[in-house]
Amino acid sequence: MEKRDSRPLYAAALTAAAVVLAVRAMYGFCWSDESFYLTFAQRLWNGQKLILDEWHPVQFYSALFYPILSLYHVLFGNRGIYLFAREVYVALAFGTAMLLYRTLCRKCAPFTSFLCAGLFLCYSRGNIWGLSYYNLFLTFCLLFACSALRKRPWAWCLGGVCLAAAVLCVPYFALFVIPGLIAALCIPKLRKRAGWTASGICILAAVFLLFFLPKDIGGVLASLKEILSDPEHSGGPVHYLAAAIRDVKLLYYYEALLTAFAGAVLLLGVKLLPKRFGALPGLLVAACGAVVSLWRYRNGELGFAYYQFAIFCLPAMALCWVKREISRPALLLRILGIAMGLSMAMSSNTEAITFTVGLPVYSMGVLVQLSALPREAAEVQLRRFGAVLACVVLCLSFASRITSVFRDGPLNTLTEPMTSGPAAGIRTTREHAEQYAGILAMLEELEDTYSSENRIFFTSILPWGYLATDFPCGAPTAWRTKLDSPQLESYCETHPMPAIVVVLEPQVGASPDKPMLNENSFSGRFWEKLQADYTPLEYPYATVYLSPNAILKGV
């Protein structure tokens, strides 16, 4: 009897998951991170420049999505741009998942390929739905992996473009890309492939340098000094990496001990017991540990379940190493995942959460490795263990992706649709909808009165405000900037003072984990200048300070 081809069924399952995600993207309004990522492209749209006008360290990747957001601006203005960016990412993630699935189907079983694609599709750092640099970094790294696993020069060149895009998302990734590329160029068997990859890197680098890097070298160097002194990233890469490792040790100390014990039991069982039962005791210990650990962190960050998969599959990987069963595609994915995790850990101050960006790729490498094992008794048990654990992680991650909400109320409270402005088409809580409508009305009044040449500054944080108007950003970054920020004072020494300063009420944009999102500090030279020279206007959710030099519309 001919075996039925299961590949279309798995492709249909991925498609159904993407449709669910596309619908879910219409719920939940994040007042901070998600819109902040879009402000980089908004600054370019308003005629400002990277580095010279924007002082946040993660700005470079905006060059990747600036063209498509600019096209949206031309066609539709700013209305609904928030939801548009979400759906663009869902479409990009779905396309990448399908490409990954088709690529891996050539290397391993369809079910393994489906699990790998599903693990990617269900992951989003922090459950942020938009074009975050975390998500795009993961996407471009997987696109590189898909290209590297093909045998065509054009695919290798395209992989180089994706690798360069990943470096724009996380610049510290270059610390792994450059040595890896040099090493590949030194190996005769890989030299041609590495040469084509390098050409792809050079293509995107040339585009970025030509169209996005300011030509004022002196100004760039001076601004880089300020960017590197960013108060939220002043610890340095080594400090952040060490902090992330310490955090993982604290969180998963008992899991590490248990998986070491499971590994010892597994190796001894394979050596001493009959082949049919040799792997079972060790795998049973690992399975029990995984279940307990998954339950322990069931309410943790989306992506933490990947830790359990990686940790409790270590005994199985150790057995593969002992038996010298090495799959090259699996090795590529595991090395890539480790490099991604380390790069993110050096780039971010969010400790253990940072490694979760690389863990899906590492987990794919584990699954592909287990799928490549010969069909013997112990190896079959390893494959089944990995597949079952991956299914559990996949289901938990998908459920968390749907039910958890980042910086908004619980899912069942997201009932109020927003019908205008950048967040049009998204549903949020009644309180947030009222705040949004009130602030949007205030901004429309300001736009009707004052010229778009005036710079605006929202404090402490309201990134979507910059998306709602044509006023250029008058702050070093749209990220959290308080009135007493030393970086704000330095910025105003080299840039014009903002003509419009919006001081938000502390409770604006509040969420369960951030009850006072816009708490401020009313001190410093900038605040003193506002008090002395600016005219205050009271609004329901903010106080607006107007400069005497503010330009009226039509003047």
Regions found by a protein language model. Name each.
Residues L38-Q42, D53-G77, E87, A166:
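Short hydrophobic/aromatic helix or loop-helix immediately within or flanking a transmembrane segment
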Residues H56, R401-T481, M497-G509, P540-L546:
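Short periplasmic/luminal acceptor-recognition loop of GT-C membrane glycosyltransferases, typified by
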Residues G95-C122, W154, G278:
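Transmembrane-helix signature of polytopic, membrane-embedded enzymes
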Residues R125, L142, S147, A155-P171, ...:
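Membrane-interface alpha helices of multi-pass inner-membrane proteins
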Residues I128-F137:
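Short acidic/glycine- and proline-prone juxtamembrane loop motifs at membrane-interface regions
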Residues L136-W156, V161-L163, F309-M317, Y362-G365:
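Specific aromatic-rich, kink-prone transmembrane helix
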Residues F176-A206, L268-L272, A372-E376:
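Perimembrane helix-loop-helix junctions
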